[in-house]
Regions:
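Buried hydrophobic residues that stabilize the cores of well-folded domains
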Residues: 20-283
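C-terminal motif of bacterial Sec signal peptides marking the signal peptidase cleavage site
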Residues: 14-16
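Sec-dependent signal peptide recognition
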Residues: 2-7
Length: 283
């Protein structure tokens, strides 16, 4: 009886293991890759003027990584053309940028190097300008990110500190601290947003916040720098405490059938209203 009981217990154990193993294991499906709207070209016009003021075109490699861009200023004589070339590795992204070559004091293009950590987030942004007598090197560093990978503070070379506020996936405020005539001061940027999702690359929000002409490089690296907002920018207000001055820009969009902004109307409290026409890599 004892032997039979042992056999029955063993059989029961085997049966329960088999029953458990027969249950299919359904793997968790991978999260869908985020949709990206790759920009091929941005053209800028003064509203009411058919003559183009500025153009920037972007080129990508086979992996859809940005490989180069060309800026054109059609209203200059001769027409000014500025090229930027990018190279990528796991450790850094480097931009060779000819922005300063129109000035005779520079002997070669500027270099912007974005160092990356093991997670692919920015750890340092260094820019180098080459003069006949040497180099001028500046660095932005001490990046700190929240749990969502959004930048919350940094140490730029041109300010003492930067603090960023996020709400519902959008960067709503940036405070830059600095000293002016021995007194602590601040520049405060506040942003509001539309309900339209921002899928643009380069990041249209950062491009518009600095406004053309001339790229400021961060629109190229918003994901690595933790600067991408979920929605498209509606307004951008800049206030300086030392002067009390405030400027404001507002943005209105026309979208195509895919929900991509193809035209942006910019109203500027200090400048001429402008229109940006956007062309995408994929039609």
């Amino acid at each position: 009886m004892k032997r039979l009981a042992s056999i029955l217990l063993a059989a029961a154990a085997l049966g329960s293991c088999s029953k458990g193993n027969d249950t299919p294991i359904v793997p968790t499906p991978p999260a869908p890759a985020p949709q990206i709207d790759y920009i091929a070209k941005i053209e800028e016009f003064e509203q009411g003027n058919p003559n183009k003021r500025y153009e920037i075109s972007f080129s990508y490699d086979a992996q859809k990584r940005l490989s180069s861009f060309v800026e054109t200023y059609p209203q200059t004589t001769p027409v000014q053309v500025i090229k930027g070339t990018l190279s990528c590795s796991d450790e850094a992204i480097t931009l060779v940028y000819e922005e300063n070559m129109s000035q005779e004091i520079f002997v070669k293009p500027a270099e912007y190097r974005l160092a990356l950590d093991a997670k692919g987030k920015a750890s340092k942004l260094q820019e180098t300008h080459h003069y006949a007598g040497g180099e001028d090197i500046h660095a932005e560093k001490d990046y700190s990110y929240n749990d969502d990978g959004q930048l919350v503070s940094s140490k730029p070379w041109y300010y003492d500190a930067t603090a960023l506020t996020w709400q519902n996936g959008d960067m709503t405020k940036v405070v830059y601290s600095y000293s002016y005539l021995g007194v602590d001061q601040s520049r405060t940027d506040t942003r509001t947003y539309t309900t339209t999702t921002n899928r643009s690359y380069p990041d249209l929000n950062l491009f518009l916040a600095t406004t053309a002409p001339t790229t400021k490089t961060k629109d190229l690296w918003s994901d690595q720098l933790g600067l991408r907002s979920t929605h498209l920018l509606s307004s951008f207000t800049e206030h300086f405490s030392h002067s009390g001055s405030t400027t404001k820009k507002t943005f209105a969009y026309k979208l195509d059938a895919k929900g991509r902004p193809t035209e942006v109307a910019l109203s500027d409290s200090e400048g001429t209203p402008r229109t940006f026409i956007i062309t995408y890599l994929e039609k």
